[in-house]
């Protein structure tokens, strides 16, 4: 599109009355130049426009931003600042990765496309923890990347995620994985004497 920001605004206008929340995805590796929105000026312009559109619609729809895992320390700090300056409810950490392929064994590891699941779990977890420390509970964190068990989900909560999402785990284990994770989480919470998830969110720090 010649006006990519307007594409997002049209989506908000069309769906703000029916959606539970709207994701501003700036991180798909399969969409040309989409990750340019991680640049400070471009992201600020986008989220300012999104906030103004919400206000013009008198809408309370939560807006969350989905980021790439392939970002550096400077980008982490800038993104955190920009999120806090705008009417943003959450951040999804993270989309698929274009790096981390050298750890794979499959001969097709260098094919084009986003890498998901276990190979990006550590990168996702580190980012969750960094953003948790910067956002200080003011913006909700949705953790994604390598969730395939109650333990892997629990780890993301400990590092600062308020919610989790999964896809690759469901591909390999089927939709019943949600019930398995729920059961495992209940056992882990009981084991640790935890009565509410809020007690464990952000209790662990990665160096």
Indicate residue ranges for each PLM-predicted region.
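Active-site glycine- and acidic-residue-rich loops that bind
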Residues: 1-9, 36-38, 42, 64-85
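Short beta-strand/loop segments at the ligand-binding rim of alpha/beta enzyme cores
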Residues: 56-69, 133-143
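Catalytic cores of alpha/beta
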Residues: 71-85, 132-137, 147-164
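Glycine/Thr-rich beta-alpha phosphate-binding loop at enzyme active sites
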Residues: 29-38, 76, 81-137
């Amino acid at each position: 599109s010649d006006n990519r920001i307007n594409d997002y605004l049209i989506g908000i206008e069309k769906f703000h009355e029916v959606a539970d929340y709207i994701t501003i995805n700036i991180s798909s590796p399969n969409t040309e130049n989409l990750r340019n929105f991680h640049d400070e000026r471009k992201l600020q312009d986008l989220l300012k426009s999104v906030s103004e559109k919400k206000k013009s619609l008198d809408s309370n729809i939560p807006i969350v931003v989905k980021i790439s895992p392939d970002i550096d320390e400077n980008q982490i700090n800038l993104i955190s600042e920009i999120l806090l300056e705008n009417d943003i409810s959450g951040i999804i950490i993270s989309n698929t990765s274009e790096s981390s392929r050298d750890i794979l064994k499959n001969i097709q590891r260098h094919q084009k496309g986003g890498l998901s699941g276990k190979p990006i779990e550590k990168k996702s977890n580190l980012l969750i923890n960094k953003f948790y420390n910067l956002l200080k509970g003011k913006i909700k964190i949705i953790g994604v990347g390598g969730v395939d068990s109650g333990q892997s989900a629990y780890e993301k909560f400990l590092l600062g995620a308020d919610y989790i999402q999964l896809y690759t785990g469901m591909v390999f284990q089927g939709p019943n994985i949600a019930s398995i994770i729920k059961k495992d989480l209940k056992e882990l919470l009981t084991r640790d004497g935890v009565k509410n998830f809020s007690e464990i969110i952000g209790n662990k720090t990665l160096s």
